[in-house]
Amino acid sequence: MNRTRLFACLLLAVLILVHESNAQCRRLCYKQRCVTYCRGRGKRSLDETNVGTSDVEKRAFDDSNVPSLVEERELEDEGSFIFD
């Protein structure tokens, strides 16, 4: 019984790691600010570039205020965002 439970836990851990490694990342840029969002993960990284310098600040933030896919398409149609 313990072997079965151990095997099930190991299998679940492997599946979670595979899912995390297959996350699809997308980079959105607008006016010297870029956001990299990886689906399958709960965080984004925000890159801010100061005008005239090459310093880039990166920080992680919660994606609770992230636009939905429909909103992203609307923004893409307006030409506001550049997808790399």
Swiss-Prot record:
Species the sequence originates in: Acanthoscurria gomesiana (Tarantula spider)
Key words, A-Z: Amidation, Antibiotic, Antimicrobial, Cleavage on pair of basic residues, Cytolysis, Disulfide bond, Fungicide, Hemolysis, Immunity, Innate immunity, Pyrrolidone carboxylic acid, Secreted, Signal
Domain of life: Eukaryota
Cellular component GO terms held in the UniProt record: extracellular region
Propeptide, residue positions: 42-84
Positions bearing Arginine amide: R41
Cytoplasm keyword on record: no
Residues carrying Pyrrolidone carboxylic acid: Q24
Disulfide bonds: C25-C38, C29-C34
Expression tissues: In hemocytes only, but not in all hemocytes observed.
Cellular location(s): Secreted
Protein's name in the database: Gomesin
The protein's role, per its UniProt record: Active against several Gram-positive bacteria such as Bacillus spp, Staphylococcus spp and E.faecalis, several Gram-negative bacteria such as E.coli, K.pneumoniae, P.aeruginosa and Salmonella spp, filamentous fungi such as N.crassa, T.viridae and yeasts such as C.albicans. It is active against the parasite L.amazonensis as well. It shows hemolytic activity.
Gene Ontology biological process terms, A to Z: defense response to bacterium; defense response to fungus; innate immune response; killing of cells of another organism
Signal peptide as annotated in the record: 1-23
